[in-house]
Curated annotation (Swiss-Prot):
The keyword Manganese applies. This is Ribonuclease HII. A divalent metal cation binds at residues 33-34, 126. Residues 27-216 form the RNase H type-2 domain. It is an enzyme of class 3 (hydrolase). Its EC number is 3.1.26.4. The lineage of its organism: Bacteria, Pseudomonadati, Chlamydiota, Chlamydiia, Chlamydiales. Its main location: cytoplasm. Its cofactor is Mn(2+); Mg(2+). GO terms for cellular component: cytoplasm; ribonuclease H2 complex. Belongs to the RNase HII family.
Length: 217
């Protein structure tokens, strides 16, 4: 567990891109990230987040580096803070199969930005150049380098996990509540046994193979 001083230093380090944008005259800087590009099932979800300048949010980090308990706490903290603006975009399995996962991810990000109650004037995007009328900076591994993108990653991850738990209630045999659609050994075994359901991405290789083998719900 990091001390308060260490957490403050980490927050400052992760605010460099935001500080640079402020110096350039921007004031509403949104971090944008996705969750669910790699899974075999479920939608891809994007989060967008505008943090208020001058306010510390200790503990915010790449969602993958946080424990489920830490991530949930920060998710609720961000949503409940009236000074924080959060948005979410969701693109369905059908759309992923139609346009491919990269384009679907971009579409989810555009949706997330559009859903913000305050329109940003600058975007910090994790790993992708996003064609958008709002000025945009692509940051490789942005969820580890920008506090706004890290916040967006938490929003996207928690929101998607909730969706996958709902899908689990419809199709408990796949274990979506545990692996969230990723290609774990248990998921691949279930796919082999039961075939794909309506929430599987038919354009992804292991799902394609099960369809070719004639295994289906």
């Amino acid at each position: 567990m990091k001390s308060i001083v260490e957490q403050e230093l980490l927050f400052r380090e992760k605010s460099v891109f935001e500080d640079q944008a402020i110096k350039q005259g921007y004031s509403r800087i949104a971090g944008v990230d996705e969750a669910g590009r790699g899974p075999l099932a479920g939608p891809v979800v994007a989060g967008a987040c505008i943090l208020p300048g001058g306010k510390l949010f200790l503990g915010i980090d790449d969602s993958k580096k946080l424990s489920p308990k830490q991530r949930r706490y920060l998710y609720e903290l961000l949503l409940e803070d009236p000074e924080v603006t959060c948005g979410v975009g969701v693109v369905s399995v059908e759309r992923i199969d139609e346009i491919n996962i990269l384009e679907a991810t971009k579409e989810a990000m555009v949706q997330a930005i559009a859903s913000l109650r305050s329109t940003p004037d600058f975007l910090l995007v994790d790993g992708l150049f996003l064609p958008h009328e709002i000025p945009c900076l692509k940051i490789i591994k942005g969820d580890s380098r920008s506090v706004s993108i890290a916040a967006a990653s938490i929003i996207a991850k928690e929101y998607r996990d909730e969706l996958m738990r709902k899908l689990h209630s419809e199709y408990p045999e796949y274990g979506f509540d545990k692996h969230k659609g990723y290609g774990t050994v248990a998921h691949l075994q279930a796919l082999k046994q039961f075939g794909p359901c309506v929430y599987h991405r038919k354009s992804f290789s292991p799902v394609k193979e099960s369809i070719r083998e004639g295994i289906c719900q």
